[in-house]
Amino acid sequence: MKVRDRIKELRRIRASELLPNPKNWRTHPVAQQDALKGVLAEIGYADALIARETPDGLMLIGGHLRAEATPDSEVPVLVLDINEEEADLMLATLDPLASMAGRDEGLLTQLLASVTSENDAVNELLRALSDNDLGGLGDFPDWGDELDEGIADDIQLCICKCGHEHHKVKE
């Protein structure tokens, strides 16, 4: 698999100057906002926001909450060389891909035993992570326990001669 490097540059820019993406579908409960502010206060920025150039300025793809939490700060931004359609795909998949990761309970237990925080919201996040109860932190949406596989009943998988998979609605 050939992977393209789409990062044009790393810029430092005032967070309030970044344009929020009007298609951003993620919402951020108060518990998440508080925990992020706590981590930023204790550690600072250790990861870049993601944006693309538009005629109106840099539009966010990833990092909306960090930008909102620190509007007066100069923040690191990875500027990507992607078009609007590619940005939409990233916006739709970036967080869900991360949330698909599993848990190694032994390693998580060891890690949590070794970390401390002076921030109440961060400590509550760590407790919830330890209890595997992030949903108990507050107003997170209830996604349910199981995937309803019935939603795929009308979808047909087609494999073309080159081996690519395509999905279409059954006729």
Give the location of each predicted region:
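Aromatic/glycine/proline-enriched transmembrane-helix motif characteristic
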Residues: M1-E171
